[in-house]
Amino acid sequence: MKYDLIIIGSGSVGAAAGYYATRAGLNVLMTDAHMPPHQHGSHHGDTRLIRHAYGEGEKYVPLVLRAQTLWDELSRHNEEDPIFVRSGVINLGPADSTFLANVAHSAEQWQLNVEKLDAQGIMARWPEIRVPDNYIGLFETDSGFLRSELAIKTWIQLAKEAGCAQLFNCPVTAIRHDDDGVTIETADGDYQAKKAIVCAGTWVKDLLPELPVQPVRKVFAWYQADGRYSVKNKFPAFTGELPNGDQYYGFPAENDALKIGKHNGGQVIHSADERVPFAEVASDGSEAFPFLRNVLPGIGCCLYGAACTYDNSPDEDFIIDTLPGHDNTLLITGLSGHGFKFASVLGEIAADFAQDKKSDFDLTPFRLSRFQ
């Protein structure tokens, strides 16, 4: 049997691609080395931020706005436990922060609903937050957070119900190209398709060693908090930059635990066994202390944490391109720790590729050729 599309890696982007391509009427095979959602990639830990006024550059804004529409659609499948929670996101940092300047520029260019507050305004609205006098806050009312594992579980279930074939707990060991299309090799045998999408995340270089992707071990942790820090008390999700440039992100508390992580830093790794569990690196439990001590002093001790991986490109922008020399294989990789919010739209882009549809987006900034 020859599929229209084989998806290699069915975590964030792959789960979305499987659903959107199957819904479009294609004969699709989703594959994964594990059983998604799982703990081996970049999607576990329950929640991920979604920000619209994008500090990483305005080129992402059209993508994230379409992503939001798709997240809203997906949330309707889980109305009791919605996948998207519109908590708002407060971006905190020094008034001269480059990241915040990019947030403001993105908001202005795309007429997004962003409110600017000075230090006193921030602390008046959220008394739990402490910032220096030279800090500002850019509050995105319409942003919030996503339930990442629930999203993947929902896409996989919807794809299966729509007739998608799924081969999980079965690593792809090689990809071959010939005049008839693409063949993947697995322990379960070989499978053929007209087209393939490679969104294998952290260990994509096991299949395609020439790709400029560097895995980095990252951690996030949950700290003791109370109802003041919850969505019910209108406490927002947040990003925060310290005076030394370190970037943090976090979420409203749930079940008396507030989740926070540090975006920069981490440990460069070269194999899966180097991604040791949380607390096996001495700094894991204390990584968020500088932010908590200065910005959220009412938060208590570390309760538990988890390790994940970023698949970093050299410039930390995404790689969305066909495999050089093989126009029937699309790469979506190098998401560099800020990709989950885009999973819905990237899955749709992958489904369009499989149908030979031209993308609605300018993907030029994400081409591999920028590294040559």
Curated annotation (Swiss-Prot):
Gene3D superfamilies listed in its UniProt record: D-Amino Acid Oxidase, subunit A, domain 2, FAD/NAD(P)-binding domain
Q: How is the cofactor bound?
A: Binds 1 FAD per subunit.
**Superkingdom of the source?**
Bacteria
Residues noted as binding FAD in the record, renumbered to the chain: 4-34
* Transmembrane spans: none
Q: Which cofactor does it need?
A: FAD
Q: Reply yes or no: does the keyword Flavoprotein apply.
A: yes
Q: What does this protein do?
A: Catalyzes the oxidative demethylation of N-methyl-L-tryptophan.
The UniProt entry's sequence similarity note says: Belongs to the MSOX/MTOX family. MTOX subfamily.
What HAMAP family does the record tag this protein with? Answer: MTOX (MF_00515)
Indicate what this protein is called per its UniProt record.
N-methyl-L-tryptophan oxidase
